[in-house]
Amino acid sequence: MADLPQKVSNLSINNKENGGDGGKSSYVPPHLRSRGKPSFERSTPKQEDKVTGGDFFRRAGRQTGNNGGFFGFSKERNGGTSANYNRGGSSNYKSSGNRWVNGKHIPGPKNAKLEAELFGVHEDPDYHSSGIKFDNYDDIPVDASGKDVPEPILDFSSPPLDELLMENIKLASFTKPTPVQKYSIPIVTKGRDLMACAQTGSGKTGGFLFPLFTELFRSGPSPVPEKAQSFYSRKGYPSALVLAPTRELATQIFEEARKFTYRSWVRPCVVYGGAPIGNQMREVDRGCDLLVATPGRLNDLLERGKVSLANIKYLVLDEADRMLDMGFEPQIRHIVEECDMPSVENRQTLMFSATFPVDIQHLARDFLDNYIFLSVGRVGSTSENITQRILYVDDMDKKSALLDLLSAEHKGLTLIFVETKRMADQLTDFLIMQNFKATAIHGDRTQAERERALSAFKANVADILVATAVAARGLDIPNVTHVINYDLPSDIDDYVHRIGRTGRAGNTGVATSFFNSNNQNIVKGLMEILNEANQEVPTFLSDLSRQNSRGGRTRGGGGFFNSRNNGSRDYRKHGGNGSFGSTRPRNTGTSNWGSIGGGFRNDNEKNGYGNSNASWW
């Protein structure tokens, strides 16, 4: 992969050595440049290798065994926990060998098969991992502000972490905490609320799961309220709730939770839209100690009386900015302020976000109490461990240029972003016809198809994933070595999030983007990002930047280097109202910042609980 930048450095059709004339000539693939007339002939795959897009999804689906798009796992798949709950709330709690007896946590027996499923087998030739280069985290800046900020930890140790959790962390091959984990673990174990500004890929999931599980393992299950349910009307009483904007992110958090609750009494569950709600209700009814949910589906379960939030000790809002961007603020406020969740003083609240604009600051002021603000520098999004290449390619030449890239060096997993669902399907079929193992994910796919596609990609059954913006944020696929922006987004923030899918966990990666005249609105933003990460700036991009500057053109997309950049600071220190620990009066009604019909996204018509037909629900 290190040679890829050199191999593709001459792909720009502005390069006159390749027959270009400053951007006007048609793109000529390298393997045809010696011929008189450029043409492109599609190779014909062997009959035994020919797979249509639909066939590939069905083949990938047989690899996963998901139940109707919902992770309805057996007791073994859930780390050994089963439904042997003592619903009366006594001191004895048993779950398939994992027990809480007389105030003591007794871990369950080891299960070699389940360990291999959860943590992988490193000796297996089909096991693919680029590893976590923890040393690359050492220079990441961290700023913590607030009253009495605890000292950060330097390594995983007990205390503060639980001994069983330490064993599971070791099984996951985590050797030392990332910067966000060094600070968040002592903050949460000290009982403080937390507002953390951290990018996806910084280890933030472990940053809230590790201390949360430590406290749950030590404190045990909460008793179910007396007369709260009868035999004919059962209800889930989770101790911890994690809200996430998309079903993809929710399932990823759930999968991580399965790892770190292995052999414990804690049983995680996940609920989200687009999957049969009956299956999810049955899973919750079997026992749910940690609930990972999207706001729309959780509101549905609350309305049906299948979930109670009365026992919530820990509330986590992951990718809070994304949830507000998607219009989820009314649903979130309904869950937190209008249901039976304990008040802010009687629960611990953790909020994680890549950015903290004003609306997120307001949400934190309402939901958090005397919180600590944590700002962690970027890991992977625009850092030097990602080699960024911007190639000038007209729309009509993109398929040829893509084949050049994939033929130059195609190792590991490649994630290709396109702007439309139709293009995702068309490009996937095109790649399959060229004998590439490709699959796609976008909003028009059923939930079962999306899960099968992701499972096939993660397992390297398909090593190319074509995706729309639904996969631009939150997806945690650690082995992606190459991100290709087949279509560049119109917002520079989206570019940052997309290329952050590679170079994860301190690893190196390559991000290649096809640029043409349709993308001039993000020229300034691209220049800033490339310069910030010490990347080579193409000549054509510099020329366009100078032309736009003379013409008074402003950078499109806004946000990242303007108003949103201010959100990475603690507003209590930088012009905010009040001092550390101050809170404004709690909002007891409907949000004043957005209508019930859509929060901050007026272009989406939906009711206060979300549109069940929306692809993001």
UniProtKB/Swiss-Prot annotation:
Gene3D superfamilies: P-loop containing nucleotide triphosphate hydrolases
This enzyme's EC code(s): 3.6.4.13
Domain Helicase ATP-binding: residue ranges: 185-374
Positions of short motif DEAD box: 318-321
Disulfide bonds: none
Gene Ontology MF annotations: ATP binding; ATP hydrolysis activity; RNA binding; RNA helicase activity; translation initiation factor activity
Ranges annotated as biased composition (Basic and acidic residues): 38-58
Motif Q motif, residue numbers: 154-182
Gene Ontology CC terms, in alphabetical order: cytoplasm
Positions with biased composition (Polar residues): 7-17, 79-90, 580-594
Localization: Cytoplasm
Protein family membership: Belongs to the DEAD box helicase family. DDX3/DED1 subfamily.
Protein name: ATP-dependent RNA helicase DBP1
Gene symbol of the encoding locus: DBP1
